[in-house]
Amino acid sequence: MDEFIGTVTGLEEINPYCFFVRVNSSYSSTVALDQVVRVDYYWGDREFHAYGMITEVKAKWDGSISTGYQEEAYNEGIYQGVPIYLGKVVVTRVLEKKGETLIPVPYSFPPPAGEKVFGACGEELGVALGFSEIRRGKRALPCGILPSGDVAYLDLKYILGDNGA
């Protein structure tokens, strides 16, 4: 089952490479750095699945006062703002759905504000980070454990110099 984390927010700039998720209030205690997420969205009649990793978590006020004294006003009961958490997501992969097939595409269209964001785990985590491709090509070298408990892999082509230094 997909784990709902939050919503793509327009409180910060959204572009094809980076967006912010406004963390669901019931989920904020467990959102974590390096967590892999997925957002599904349409651009015209095209369907996309964007994957990314949370690289930063920040708290801010959701309200109209911006004097810098919200904390005192909130503690005195004067300010009715709501503290919110935003997770910065750096996009790792975008796939376009064509029929029943998902095809990697360049990052061209950002997810629109308001789209739901879900946690990625298991097989989906492998797709998000490219592990499924290197495992399929029999060039995956296990190298560690991700915060989710899943195995991380290195691509042997890079280690052996076929695709890298």
Model-identified regions with their sequence ranges:
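Basic- and hydrophobic-enriched, low-structure N-terminal and domain-boundary segments
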Residues: M1-G164
